[in-house]
Amino acid sequence: MTTHGAERAALDGGRQPMPRRLVPVVALLFLAPWAAECSWGGFAGTDMLGVVVVLAPMYGGAAVLIREAARRTGGGWPMIVLLAAGFGVLQAGLVDQSLFNPDYLADTEFAELSAADRTRVPVLGISAQQAISFVGNHVALTICAPIAIVESYLAPTRRLRPWLRVPGLVVVAVLYLLGSLLVFADDSGRKGFLASPGQLVGAAAVVLALVVLAALPRWRRRPLPAPAGAPRPTRPGLLVLLVYLGVSMLSGWIGVAVSVVVVAALVWMLARWSGHADWGQRQVLASAAGALVGAAVLAYLVPPYSPASPTQALISDVIVSLLAIAMLTGAYARVRRHESVPAYPG
């Protein structure tokens, strides 16, 4: 999409009634924290609503701001993925500082299961395995999957349009800052830990580098699409699902090395496929579904943060599965309804 096209889309989006523009914003605000913390079984069913409400300003605010930045500038999915990675480092490195805190999971059910110390890098004070897990899940579950799902519910003419005007963006930015401050101030999460100045500067430098990379003009200069040849939606969906589950099961330095190679290959393959003229929203949704279904499957294999009986854990995991199925089924039905519209270029 050209810069002129993005500007015209912004003007068109601004003419829509406010309630119509706010529905997807609210949906993304609440879907992002659910996908980030609940979709993989992190919390019991009775706690999900509270978790979503408390974390919506931070996780949801970030998702909305990243989506608006990409759609307003025409940066598309490359920009979304890079900004999502920046958010992952910002969140884990500067806000809750889980990237550096060796005791971050000490009082949870993951304390006995974590193999993070086996891949700890003494100079940096991080676990390579946890860095991949924390940042990767923020990219896949907190940002990319929720954006793809919410946009799938919209008509094709609205998927690339901004949802908010400047005042709305300011409100969401303030919500994000307040939500982040709330998490940072919660000492029960950080357990009194504060990263060293060197760690904070290093994390901030990585975030800045990712933001600068995301802002490069090259993402707004799209080459002409290749001839038809994109795979059916099931193919990228299954590929993302297998990679998500496989990476989640790996541990140790060998697991870290394999994860980096496999994830890089996945990103390359999706980027290659998306360059074809017949790559559409169904493929985008299938890729998001692969991550969300992978998280729902993982929920049956890992415990929640807090102790729960086997029955409580199973009920919560079933709730997660049903919500994911309902959400994805509805999104797929909406895309099918509009599938006669020309292929999705984002």
Where are the language model's segments positioned?
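Transmembrane alpha-helical insertion/packing segments
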Residues: 2-55, 225-231, 252-287
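Transmembrane alpha-helical segments in integral membrane proteins
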Residues: 137-157
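Juxtamembrane "helix-exit" motif on the non-cytosolic side of transmembrane helices
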Residues: 37-44, 181-190, 246-250, 298-308
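Hydrophobic alpha-helical membrane-insertion segments
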Residues: 83-102
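Hydrophobic alpha-helical transmembrane segments
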Residues: 119-144
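Loop-centered beta-sheet repeat module
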Residues: 158-211
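Central hydrophobic cores of alpha-helical transmembrane segments in multi-pass inner-membrane proteins
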Residues: 53-68
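Extended, charged low-complexity segments
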Residues: 218-346
